[in-house]
Structures are given as C-alpha cells and as structure tokens.
Amino acid sequence: MMLRALKMPTIGRHAEEVAQKAEREGWTFGQYLRHLVSLEVEERRRRRIERHQRESNLPGEKTLATLNRKRLPPPVSRQLATLCEGGFVERGENVLLFGLPGRGKTHVACAIGHELVRRGRRVLFTPTYALVQRLLGAKRELRLEKELAELDGFDAVILDDIGYVQQSRDEMEVLFTFLAERYERKSVLITSNLVFSEWNRIFKDPMTTAAAIDRLIHHAVILEMTGGSVRAERAEETIKEARATTTTTATTTTTVAATTTATSEDQLGEM
C-alpha cells in the first residue's frame, strides 16, 4: 500500500521474489535495496519511452533498422550515427534535409527521431501544413502562447515537407514565430524539396524569408539527399516481381495443361 502511495509499484511487485534471490545468494540489505530500486528505475524508463513514442507521431516503419544505408549519400551516411546520439539536441542545433521527392529525407529524419526517443528525448513528427494549421487555430482562439509553450516541451520537432506549404500572411507569421521561439534553444529537423533560394515561395516576404533562413542555419547540420528516387526504385522492383510471378504462373499453367493432355491421350490409347 505504501509503495503504491509512493508510486513505486515495481518494487512492490518484485520485493518478495528479489528477497528470496537475495537470501539464496547471500546479498547484503544494501544490495537487495539497490536491485529493487534499479528495477523501478528501469521500468519507469521503459514506460516513459513508450509514452514518448506514442506522442511523437513518428511513422513506425521509418526506423534506423529499415533504412537502406547503402543508398545514402556518403556525407549523410557518415553523419547519421552522430546525429542519432542526440548531441545536436543538447546544443539546440537544427538538422535540415534537402533533396528531390523520393530521396529518403523523411525516412532519415524519422530514423533520427526514433533514436532520440529511445534515448529518452521527447520528439514530435508533423507535416508542416498540419503544424501551421494547429498554430493558426490557436492564434484565432487567442491561445498561441500556450500552444507554443506546449510545443516547447519537445526536445526536437520534425517538420516534414516544408516546401509544400503555400501560406497566407497569417500562416507565414505563425510558422516564423514557431521557428523564432525555438532559435538556439530547441532543435528543429526540417525536410524540404526546395533549396533556400526558393524559400520565398514559403514565406513570401523577402525579409521574413532571410530572417527564417538565418535562424535555421546559424546552428545547423545540412544534409543533401542526392541520388535516385527510392520510391521509383521500389515501384520498379514491385513491377519486376509482379512480372516474375506472372511468368512463373503462366509456365506452371502450361506445364499442367501439357501433362493433362498427355494423360488424356494415354488413356484414350489404352481404350
């Protein structure tokens, strides 16, 4: 009862079991207590990571394990392990991923995000347009400051496809406000199909565009995702597999038909 009140349920569940082990192995009371506390700490860590994973909205399939590292540009491949360690988050730095559609920008950003969560960080993945609408709604309801404070609780926010956002002035302003609020304090990971020279299509106003870029690149790691389209290559592989399956099926059907014909002829001959 007291352990539940103290919010230490893991110790309560394992106390008797660990006591028996301690008696068998001749532990001191200090060893017994340290072991119980370590179980409680580990269980809390596990639950915290599960909670952070749920709230992150990270696509479950875009992890480091499913990332084809052989396809990554060498500079990206060299920096990936360091980024996954999360040092850039501690320094409030940003990660900017540029490249044409289908080059794996989102997968790399999400893989980094999953690793950060695994290391105890709070991460939020969101399409840029969704974040903009969220902030715009908060502004209309006069709670933008509260919404920004809530987002400030995340160690890293992944803004996916910033290049697809064609904003009104109000939308541009809330996005700029969000980026300015996190400047030099909290990390942002951004994927974009547009190079910086084309960002005037996002922010419209040249001065706002320059100010946004300046804040993002001041402390940033820039990853250029070159090479072929991952999606196009996967589509080509799927087509090849479908053709191979069709060919195999056709061959099997022909063989079965030939066997059936031969059997029928043999039976007629016997008659």
Placement of each model-derived feature along the sequence:
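Short hinge/gating elements
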Residues: 1, 17-21, 66, 94-98, ...
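Solvent-exposed alpha-helical segments within well-ordered globular domains of core cellular machineries
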Residues: 1-4, 13-16, 34, 65, ...
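Interdomain "pre-motor" coupling segment immediately N-terminal to P-loop NTPase/helicase cores
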Residues: 4, 8-60
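AAA+ P-loop ATPase motor domain of ring mechanoenzymes
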Residues: 37-87, 229-242
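Conserved P-loop
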Residues: 75-153, 200-202
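Walker B motif beta-strand of ABC-family P-loop ATPases
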Residues: 156
